Amino acid sequence: MTRIKRGFVARKRRKKVLNLTKGFRGSSSVLFRPANQRKMKALRFSYRDRRQRKRDLRSLWITRINSASRLYNLNYSQFVYKLKQLNIHINRKWLAQLAIRDYKVFDELIKTVF
């Protein structure tokens, strides 16, 4: 059986990890083992935070809708409840955008709710 040398494969694998960890602090961007550990942790964080971002944005939208609807003496839960009663289907992202960017349309929406 012939001998297989794998120096190239190992170097390529290590180089790939070090390229991913460019910009990390300390030895995490220079040495392979700490870089590999930081890479694995960074990937775990990114996986977790992709899910967390959805929750954060939803709560941000709700906060924006609540603050905009309180200008009309109506809190968020009452506003959403009345929208559902009137069978108006606008998601929270759109409502938040309307409250910030196009407040005239949001004003009309509030008037239809009353």
Curated annotation (Swiss-Prot):
Domain of life of the source: Eukaryota
This protein's UniProt keywords: Chloroplast, Plastid, Ribonucleoprotein, Ribosomal protein, RNA-binding, rRNA-binding
Subcellular location: Plastid, Chloroplast
SUPFAM superfamilies given in the database record: Ribosomal protein L20
Annotated Pfam families: Ribosomal_L20
A GO molecular function held by the record: structural constituent of ribosome
Transmembrane segments annotated in the record for this chain: none
One Gene Ontology term from the biological process aspect of the record: ribosomal large subunit assembly
Gene Ontology CC: chloroplast; ribonucleoprotein complex; ribosome
Family listed: Belongs to the bacterial ribosomal protein bL20 family.
Function: Binds directly to 23S ribosomal RNA and is necessary for the in vitro assembly process of the 50S ribosomal subunit. It is not involved in the protein synthesizing functions of that subunit.
HAMAP family tied to this protein: Ribosomal_bL20
Name of this protein: Large ribosomal subunit protein bL20c
UniProt organism field: Tupiella akineta
